[in-house]
Amino acid sequence: MKHALVTGAAGLIGSHIVDLLVREGWQVRALDNLEPQTHRRGKPAWINPKAEFIEGDMRNRDAITAALEGIEIVFHQAAYGGYMPEIAKYVHVNSLGTAQMLEVIREKNLPIKKIVVASS
């Protein structure tokens, strides 16, 4: 069985990727920080219950390390997209969070075969 991590799994695109992978028979780990500005009521009901859900932040090295354990492919959809611009937060989450994930993969020599990154 293939093992995938979807970051930003509570978002529109991330949640659909989770659903598709589960339908295709993948073992899916779903990571999202459940940003209160977007997810006021906590974990959304639309997150596929067959996926292992981890509430965690891309800026938290321990959360990223735990989420990557046993994973073969990463669908990286996590991004801060608030509607009250906070430039420093955008940079920390969207750029430095991605860089931190890549550093963890390299430093721990994780056997990730592929990373699919959403970007703008």
Q: What residue ranges belong to the model's regions?
A:
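Residues at the starts of beta-strands that form the adenosine-phosphate
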Residues: 3, 27, 114
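NAD(P)H-binding glycine-rich loop region in Rossmannoid oxidoreductase-like domains
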Residues: 55-93
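Conserved glycine-rich Rossmann-like NAD(P)H-binding loop of the short-chain dehydrogenase/reductase
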Residues: 26-37
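Short, conserved active-site loop motifs that form the nucleotide-linked donor/cofactor pocket
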Residues: 50-52
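Conserved Rossmann-fold NAD(P)-dependent oxidoreductase catalytic core, especially the SDR/UDP-sugar
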Residues: 100-120
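Conserved internal alpha-helix in NAD(P)-dependent oxidoreductase domains
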Residues: 88, 92-99, 113
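SDR active-site strand-loop-helix element
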Residues: 7, 31, 74-78, 115-120
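N-terminal Rossmann NAD(P)H-binding glycine-rich loop of SDR-like oxidoreductase domains
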Residues: 4-24
